[in-house]
Amino acid sequence: MKHLIFTALFLLSYTVAVRAQIVFPTPNQVEMQTGNLILGKKVSMYAEDTTAFYLNLFREEVRSHTPIKWQKKEAKADICWITDSSLPPEGYRIKIHPQQMVISASDKGGFTYAVQTLRQWAAGSAGSITFACASVTDYPRTQWRCF
């Protein structure tokens, strides 16, 4: 009986530890890092285009009912949305640090896929949302995305 309880507790702790790593479809590259980014009731964001639809999608999917304060400088924002033309079409890179998250994408499609990854990556609790620190890079492996 002791072995059964020990095994059950071990497996439970393992599933909790890898919770933040489960994203479907699996990104091309995921590098886990130590720490978490915890977003509370107030979130500041920086974006080159504050009217982009993927920002509304992010708010609906991940941070609903949270007031957003827009920043004019990247360094002051909790979350930064940056266009990076060096990424392939529909590609994105997410870098999550304990103090800031930077989402880079080549185009609006890439930002949309990044939001879907963040939706799965987020762990919510009372009044806050937590993201495990990591670097995630993804882009289509073929001409079109599919499961």
What are these regions (language model features)?
Residues M1-V23:
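Bacterial Sec-dependent N-terminal signal peptides
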Residues A17-T142:
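Acidic, contiguous N-terminal accessory segments
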Residues R145-F147:
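Hydrophobic faces of well-ordered beta-strands that scaffold small-molecule active sites
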